[in-house]
Amino acid sequence: MESKTFWIVTLLLCGTIQLAICRSEEKSTEKTMMLGGVHDLRGNQNSGEIESLARFAIQEHNKQQNKILEFKKIVKAREQVVAGTMYHLTLEAKEGDQTKNFEAKVWVKPWMNFKQLQEFKESSS
């Protein structure tokens, strides 16, 4: 009987500890990434995929505004989970003889083969 009680108490303690650990990790994750919030891009912001999105943003802006911007580099990349992913990119581009920073928002829904430039403007900083 004593052995049975020992095992029941041990199992209850282990379960309680496991639950506490899971809740602690859950709260930690909530603090670092709020659903729908903009956060720094995980991984390499200069990956081929992100560079491709930056080049797409410049290409679309050039078409829409009849401009000739030339991509130089990605300065900063952030993402936001929406119905898909909204990429917030700060990029450097050459306009004539000047190099300037621009901010672009590109909305991507990979399961629909959808990519759209939502915003493109010269950076104030």
UniProtKB/Swiss-Prot annotation:
Single GO term (MF): cysteine-type endopeptidase inhibitor activity
Xref: CDD domains: CY
Segments forming domain Cystatin: 36-124
Site feature Reactive site, where: 36
Main localization category: secreted
Keywords carried by this UniProt record: Plant defense, Protease inhibitor, Secreted, Signal, Thiol protease inhibitor
Any one biological process term the GO annotation gives: response to water deprivation
Keyword Signal: yes
Official protein name in the record: Cysteine proteinase inhibitor 3
Organism whose genome encodes this protein: Arabidopsis thaliana
